[in-house]
């Protein structure tokens, strides 16, 4: 019998594969945005599979989006969850409730406009935009989605919009000014 060699943490494998990446230790909340049946037509007939779109986040500025396909819905959701955990990004939240400025996100034919709102306004958003903003941890935002309403593209446009946000500190640093000069 062959003995299995144990690898040290920083030791490279002989087959040049990357070492297994551990799942994040934080537990993230999850929202299933969409599950749908998809069909591939072949000469042997129709092959039916399921596609799932899942959002994960910690409601403190972390958010990730993933998709998965499988023969069963539960397997598709599991794959989508794993994909979402790989695609987690951090986005800024001002005062634990809103965004610093208006922003527009585009994905395909979808445009999403997101605007900050006064305290107590609540989330004025629909569909996938609302899901992304809730899982990210926002409380006071207004939004409008234009063009295509395809859920995955709306979610991707929302995340791209949130990733393009800049804090006052980042703007001040880019302009070579102090934060007080930027805020007026």
What are these regions (language model features)?
Residues 1-184:
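Ribosome-associated RNA-binding proteins
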């Amino acid at each position: 019998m062959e003995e299995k060699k144990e690898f040290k943490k920083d030791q490279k494998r002989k087959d040049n594969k990357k070492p297994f990446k551990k799942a994040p230790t934080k537990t993230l909340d999850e929202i299933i945005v969409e599950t749908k049946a998809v069909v591939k037509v072949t000469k042997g007939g129709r092959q039916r599979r399921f596609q799932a779109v899942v959002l994960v986040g910690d409601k403190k500025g972390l958010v990730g989006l993933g998709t998965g396909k499988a023969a069963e819905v539960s397997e598709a959701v599991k794959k989508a969850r794993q994909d979402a955990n790989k695609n987690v990004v951090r986005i800024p939240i001002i005062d634990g409730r809103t965004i610093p400025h208006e922003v527009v996100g585009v994905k395909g034919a979808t445009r999403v406009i997101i605007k900050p709102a006064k305290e107590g306004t609540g989330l004025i958003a629909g569909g996938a935009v609302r899901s992304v903003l809730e899982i990210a941890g926002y409380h006071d935002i207004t939004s409008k989605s234009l063009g295509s309403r395809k859920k995955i593209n709306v979610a991707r446009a929302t995340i791209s919009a949130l990733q393009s946000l800049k804090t006052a500190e980042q703007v001040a640093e880019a302009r070579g000014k102090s934060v007080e000069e930027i805020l007026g």
